[in-house]
UniProtKB/Swiss-Prot annotation:
InterPro entries: Na/H_antiporter_dom_sf, NhaA. GO terms for biological process: regulation of pH. Belongs to the NhaA Na(+)/H(+) (TC 2.A.33) antiporter family. Keywords: Antiport, Cell inner membrane, Cell membrane, Ion transport, Membrane, Sodium, Sodium transport, Transmembrane, Transmembrane helix, Transport. Pfam families: Na_H_antiport_1. This is Na(+)/H(+) antiporter NhaA. Na(+)/H(+) antiporter that extrudes sodium in exchange for external protons. GO terms for cellular component: plasma membrane. The gene is nhaA.
Amino acid sequence: MNLFLKKLLKNDATGGVVLIVAAAFAMFLANNDSTRHAYQAMLTLPVQFRFGALDINKDLLLWINDALMALFFLMIGLEVKRELMMGSLKGRERAMFPLIAALGGMLAPGLIYAAFNHQDAQAIHGWAIPTATDIAFALGILALLGSRVPAALKMFLMALAVIDDLGAIVIIALFYTSELSLISLTVAAASIAVLAVLNGCGVRKTSVYLAVGMVLWVAVLKSGVHATLAGVIVGLFIPLKKQEGHSPAIELAHGLHPWVSWLILPLFAFANAGISLSGVSLNGLFSAVPLGITLGLFIGKPLGITLICWLAVKLKIAALPENTRLIDIAAVGVLCGIGFTMSIFIASLAFDGAHEELVTLAKLGILSGSVISALVGYTLLRVKLR
């Protein structure tokens, strides 16, 4: 491999561009009369996996979202663990910071949405739609700024978005899931216990953790909870400490990085960004549902994150990540308003069985709020990091 190609593959900004191009191409295909049906048919292509009594039969889209994205979340779990143990989030006060930020970033958007829709018995079910952050697209936009982004700021966004996603998974399980499989949840809990024992006994063979992780992934998938959660959990248990110059967590993260940046995230963007705008009108943007979502994402996210972080620092409950200021946190908070795929998923659950118009209006609000947040967040950070 020549030097230019090596540099290109290691360039985070280039990976961000590929993600945006994949998303734009998906939007084109989904809104073009001659390609719309072929695009949808490809994503709904059934893919079956059988191994003994195990039978998993899902559409291609769900394999990308549940299986490939579990590897992305595995890498995120590894990166967050490293920062918690030896990086910018080390120490109780700094570790608490993204947790508190995520809570504020979920509370404020939900309240803003509720303020616009509390009188509509159907629309109020969508209160959780603007609470989500699409970690893949948020990191993709941040990656466009390349090496200018301080590592501490990137890790803060990563940790905040992971906690945000975990919060969204809990909300979905509590408010939007009718049935959870207790047997599968028990198997998942047992798998986590095995991972903890392996880590406690000092087992350093990565393949052992990944094997248990596959059992955990299947159990979480079958339980009715979002399967990507398994990736984060496995990443947090893989040993980090070096022994004879060998760190399983760091080496696995480095190995996953090019696959995630150049294959998994672009595929995710291509499969999920194809939102059909058929039946959408700009007049509808100013109705209560899309307005509540747009303002919840663009205003509520950064406002909630910034205010609660300011309060936590003042009360000495948490501490800012090293080499960052509150204005940096506010700018990253704007990027957290990119709800996109996770928000669309919650909208489909919230308005399941309701009038299709609510789903269309929700998508309009999600798209407008996410695009505005991406553009403004990128601009703010670019100006600040100049």
